[in-house]
């Protein structure tokens, strides 16, 4: 455990640390790009028992240096700047003085910072910005035919280092996607140029490991973290970020709304190997004391620049909540449930004006392309109950998001589209179809959707069902839901449950889409299960710790790890053990010609007796006199 300075959490007897070290049964590896460029991509290999004769299973890894035993983790220093040289080598950025941090950035902390958290010790004095007239977005490079190191990294990462993915099992229904057998850097470039994929990669977040979000790539997941006005602890937030990426979160959104927003975000960004997203309107609202009506374009613009200079990779912008759409939500069961959507709806009604986000959208886009920040166009009118699913308000906003997508693409800025929400199973595909139509195949990023409203405490399951379905239909990234959804802020355990549930949904979607090699891990686990390789079963699972814990609740002895049964059926009724015995028996019969002949004769005799049974009217034990014997 690498401890964060104890000053970050004065309420704890011992300082909170971040989890480090390899995931059980796995090792960190670095795979060289096949182009010979020197780019090395981090992955994870799950090691199997030597006696099995099976090779390691390679899996996508989001955990960054935290699972590398050779890495030195110092939270106060931050992570190595993987992309720094790539960014500067392009020659289109300049250094500028970072905007001065103000009290309102941290929730009106005074000059003495009382009630605040320590500032990150190594805050940059200079930050990067595009040179005047330049555009530093990955989409801009892609449309000029340039394959960036980020695109090359993504290609190697998506292939998991395999040279011939088509050799693996591929079976599924892709609903019109264009998933290749093998991902090349040119394929990545083309997908980004078309707007069908994004690589969130702010030039001021060089610590991030490039990843792609798009329907023709592996389905990704996002984890939300963040403090609130009633719960703020930067150490816990950094730990939740590290914990969530350990279990598979591809991106993390910092949704902080309380005090210390700026400083908390700095700690997270400097220690995050995955893209970080935010909802800037939350911080802007804090700057006006929580009064939505007092928001202005100038305050919002300043907040965007503040976060852009820190390195936020994508912004949720609720520019689709327009004044004419607000009355459409009035007849809903649950009205407007999006925080950002409700803030903008209130502002529109108070001023009886069009949203300043919509009016100034092109100016926002100018900021985005100067730092390579991707849009995550917010669904402020998403349904908050299945009764409101697929209604007029939801789809009116969706078509506006399509219009805004085209405006952003006109300036070569990357875009993904946020989606619902609460949608019953039979209405899910309509959401995907309309999004593809309205938004030109821009990546879809959905919260679930939750398929029923009756399970508070289990909404990671109600939403996991919808997430697997919509991921199969084409959603590129799934925003996790934890068991605490609708009930409270998730803690560390809730974050893990949410992430693992959504990794399951994303993987199920990859299988259903027929993604090359998606089934390799499933087949390896199935084989380990049939061969009673218990440790391999644990290690191949999404959550090895919980799998072994459940096994050990009834069979904790070390010998049980090699036993040919579990506590479900016991040694005499294990179906797989019996199947193995049947296999061995059949194998022996086939090897022994006399035994094979005897088996054939026995089968012939059984067929004859079966016919007698049919001929006698299916009566049992018929005697010579035609009477049934007792």
Curated annotation (Swiss-Prot):
MF-aspect GO terms: 4 iron, 4 sulfur cluster binding; carbon-carbon lyase activity; zinc ion binding
Entry keyword annotation includes 4Fe-4S: yes
Entry binding sites for substrate: 224, 253, 282, 318, 338-340, 379-382, 418, 445
Listed name of the protein: Phosphomethylpyrimidine synthase
EC numbers, comma separated: 4.1.99.17
Any one annotated GO CC term: cytosol
Protein family (similarity comment): Belongs to the ThiC family.
Record's cofactor remark: Binds 1 [4Fe-4S] cluster per subunit. The cluster is coordinated with 3 cysteines and an exchangeable S-adenosyl-L-methionine.
HAMAP family xrefs: ThiC (MF_00089)
Name of the coding gene: thiC
Native species: Sphingopyxis alaskensis (strain DSM 13593 / LMG 18877 / RB2256)
Binding residue positions for [4Fe-4S] cluster: 566, 569, 574
Subunit structure: Homodimer.
NCBIfam families: PRK09284.1 (NF006763), PRK13352.1 (NF009895), thiC (TIGR00190)
Assigned keywords, A-Z: 4Fe-4S, Iron, Iron-sulfur, Lyase, Metal-binding, S-adenosyl-L-methionine, Thiamine biosynthesis, Zinc
Binding site for Zn(2+): 422, 486
